[in-house]
Amino acid sequence: MEREGKSDPIPIDIILDILSRLSTNSIAKFGLASKFCGSILRGQDFIELFLITRPLSRPRLLFAVQNSDKWCLYSSPQSQFPDENHSLVVSADFHMELRRDMGQEIFGLVSGLLYFPNTRTGEVPVICNPSTGQYARLTQRSSMNNLSSLLGYDPIGKKYKVITPSSSHFDPENILTLGTGKVAWRSIRCLVDHYPESEGICINGVLYYMASNKFQFSGVKIASFNVRYETLKFLNADVDVTFCPALAKLINYKGKLCVLSCLWDNQIYPKPLRWKVLMLWLWVLEDAEKEEWLKREYTLPVNIVHGNVSVVGVTATGEIILSMDYTSESFFVYYFNPERNTLEKVEIQGFEGSEKNLSSRVYTFVDYAEDVKFI
């Protein structure tokens, strides 16, 4: 029997099936092996197959700890029913280390990717996949102005876009689409020049953020940018909603935009107690078309929340999650159920000693799940 000189190529569907069963770290290494491998893993067919073949896992909390010389990423289980009987101490799993020069701050976890805007340093923005460790530095814009940039995601077209809202007519390059093979800034026309005053939150393909422009409108407004159609509008909201962007955070509240402010108040209880309590104010955009807002106000139970904390998000069932801002000997995450008015404190162990004798900044993100998107 004569042996043929060439064997038949392996069908692409078999290759996809084999790759989908690898760990995320192995997938990341395979994607760097060649352009052919990378093109397979960037394809939507592989991404969808990966999600199908993986068992459904509960969402997790992702922690990005900013040490002096590196970023350290951890994750821990995200409690599903924090006001029921469960362990109040959970361990954080170490994921990976990232280079410190990737950025000074993180502007959100957007559909599985971390975004380092690098506005303060003037460096180009960086996008990173915390599941694989893969990252990409964006191309430099022709303008050298240190403009704030934001990352949005179009779930229909499955495209990420970076926008740099400008307050100058002399800075035309303001949008970058990723994953097209043509990494170049281009121009879209915004009817009103403005400057972002907050991080953004992308909900169902709409990127929301607070914006200002002292020359064209007073105060701060909420910008609404449709990532797919690249259209911009400003929402009508009471001045109470945007009175202080530094204290407010835009979050996804059960699929709706919510502006949440938290503030310590020691005037509620009379002397000599003067206990500090944490007040939460929520403005939920109940009807986006009519721009109708619903205000809610909560007082968290006394003497449970300690230290510098921030609201980091809301679970699918409506629990508001607060997290400490810096590492310490004991690090806590808090789950507040507004319907039951319950507050549970969960200790996170595993990264409290990531850098001895230093208090490191911690960025916490909710609903984290493994993702193999390649940039």
Curated annotation (Swiss-Prot):
F-box domain sequence ranges: 5-52
SUPFAM superfamilies: F-box domain
Pfam families linked: FBA_3 (PF08268)
Alphabetized NCBIfam families for the sequence: F_box_assoc_1 (TIGR01640)
The protein, known as: Putative F-box protein At5g52620
Annotated organism of origin: Arabidopsis thaliana
High-level lineage: Eukaryota, Viridiplantae, Streptophyta, Embryophyta, Tracheophyta
